[in-house]
Amino acid sequence: KKFNYRIISYNSMTRAIVLGGSRGIGKAIAESLKSIGMDVFAASKNDIDTSNLDSVKKFVQIHNQTDVLVLNTGGPVAKGFANITEEEWNKYHNQLFLGFCIILQNIKINDDGYIFLISSSVIKEPNSKLIISSAYRAAFSEVFKILSKDYAAKNISCINIAPGLINTDRT
């Protein structure tokens, strides 16, 4: 396969939206983007709760266009399959899957922009104690992969970052 690499140039990009931007890896990303002169909206759970679809819909009405979008959210606590409740399945379906779908349907990414998905290493190596995270992050990663071909026509890069364990208050 031949890969077409382009040099990342932030000169023409001015705006970024970072979900989960108030702590952890999201905060580090937001601070890095600010350090290169971008106007960054580092969204906290008070700004958007991706597990609450009404919150997602309100957010995209206000924040509906950007140069860089970082899809990032925390995940469920470690729990065995038999102990997961129906409410937890529904909450994390929205938080890790459907909320991101609604965001991508409603936020315009400017041509030559970037979408970063901060998923998890569980998309490649599922973890029996993180079954909800493993399932929904892998499912959305597949949607993201398919959509990346459509975004490529506008020279929008879609990058899925799948980190391992991050030292935050969740770990």
Where are these predicted regions, by residue range?
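Short beta-loop-alpha junction of Rossmann-like oxidoreductase domains
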Residues: 79, 156, 165-171
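Rossmann-fold scaffold of SDR-type NAD(P)-dependent oxidoreductases
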Residues: 19, 66-74, 96, 117, ...
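Rossmann-fold cofactor-recognition segment
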Residues: 43-54
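Catalytic Tyr-X3-Lys loop
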Residues: 75, 82-102, 116, 133, ...
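Hydrophobic positions on the long internal alpha-helix
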Residues: 70, 99-107, 143-144
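N-terminal Rossmann NAD(P)H-binding glycine-rich loop of SDR-like oxidoreductase domains
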Residues: 22, 30
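Catalytic loop of short-chain dehydrogenase/reductase
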Residues: 116-140, 144-153, 165-166
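Flexible cofactor-recognition loop at the NAD(P)H-binding site
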Residues: 23, 74-77, 121
